[in-house]
Amino acid sequence: MGPAVLLAILCLGVAEVTQSSDPSLDSEWQEWKRKFNKNYSMEEEGQKRAVWEENMKLVKQHNIEYDQGKKNFTMDVNAFGDMTGEEYRKMLTDIPVPNFRKKKSIHQPIAGYLPKFVDWRKRGCVTPVKNQGTCNSCWAFSAAGAIEGQMFRKTGKLVPLSTQNLVDCSRLEGNFGCFKGSTFLALKYVWKNRGLEAESTYPYKGTDGHCRYHPERSAARITSFSFVSNSEKDLMRAVATIGPISVGIDARHKSFRLYREGIYYEPKCSSNIINHSVLVVGYGYEGKESDGNKYWLIKNSHGEQWGMNGYMKLARGRNNHCGIASYAVYPRV
């Protein structure tokens, strides 16, 4: 087959896909590509457009149901709008809830009054939202965020810590860099290593690299770490009395990937399957407390264009929704 014939076949394939697309969405497609800096090859354009249109229709129908009072949150065709579910799931990492958690220190709840609203951002404990990119490093961002909060409470200084340090250097503890990892093993590394560098001295690259940790540049240390028992009440107490807590959740669903704002509740979410690490930075409720619209405030690592400027309100008090309390851990400094 000659080059000219092959090119003609390729062009014909792209033309057929383009012709099947909805022309009324042309301007929205071009604007979306500009907004998220998307550039495709001639072969990719049609396939990505088809996926994007499917997601666009899903989002519009969901938001109609939100306007009708059938949903509690809205969705948006964000940077993941051209991804299939299979492609997005490759960005997640299966995180088995370890059997050894019973042998490790378990947070002992402190009795007493708990505030109805907590938001550690307002107390200066939380660094800006970051973007993990295509590296499966959510576990590193979650662990670093928990340490940042504790270091701030101890020193009064908020220092962004190096997630790349964790990606590159915690393999001996059992993490696998950009392939997969866990917050527990990340904290174990910092504890054994007796230090973690700052983002300023060990910046994030979003790819696997050789460990370049220098003890003299350490910006944080931890003395131990503890799990929170598998209970939303205990997690609530830990968030209120200790600070931002690292947790794992089930984030496999399109509704999570394309979340925009509101209190996220996904009936298909599992409380036993954990595949994404985030940081709980607070909790509260919308409307009247008696309305039952309670939420966890979580910080994600998909950039500020995802969700509520990088954050999500996830349903609280709904039977450990999405496993929010199944894998909660925090450091001591």
Curated annotation (Swiss-Prot):
Its EC number is 3.4.22.-. The keyword Glycoprotein applies. Glycans are attached at residues 39, 72. One of its GO terms (biological process) is proteolysis. GO terms for cellular component: endosome; extracellular region; lysosome. Residues 21-113 form a propeptide. It is found in: Secreted; Lysosome; Endosome. GO terms for molecular function: cysteine-type peptidase activity; peptidase activity. Its main location: secreted. Keywords: Disulfide bond, Endosome, Glycoprotein, Hydrolase, Lysosome, Protease, Secreted, Signal, Thiol protease, Zymogen. CDD domains: Peptidase_C1A. InterPro entries: Papain-like_cys_pep_sf (IPR038765), Pept_his_AS (IPR025660), Peptidase_C1A (IPR013128), Peptidase_C1A_C (IPR000668), Peptidase_C1A_papain-like (IPR039417), Prot_inhib_I29 (IPR013201). The active site is at 138, 276, 300. Expressed in placenta. Highly expressed in a subset of trophoblast giant cells in the parietal yolk sac and at the outside of the ectoplacental cone. Expressed at highest level in liver with lesser amounts in testis, kidney, heart, lung and brain. Not detected in spleen and skeletal muscle. Not detected in blood, heart, brain, testis, liver, lung, kidney, thymus or uterus. SUPFAM superfamilies: Cysteine proteinases. Residues 1-20 form the signal peptide. Pfam families: Inhibitor_I29, Peptidase_C1. Disulfide bonds join 135-178, 169-211, 269-322. Belongs to the peptidase C1 family. PANTHER family: CYSTEINE PROTEASE FAMILY C1-RELATED. Probable protease. In placenta, plays a role in promoting giant cell differentiation. Also plays a role in placental spiral artery remodeling by direct degradation of smooth muscle alpha-actin. This is Cathepsin 8. It comes from Mus musculus (Mouse). The lineage of its organism: Eukaryota, Metazoa, Chordata, Craniata, Vertebrata.
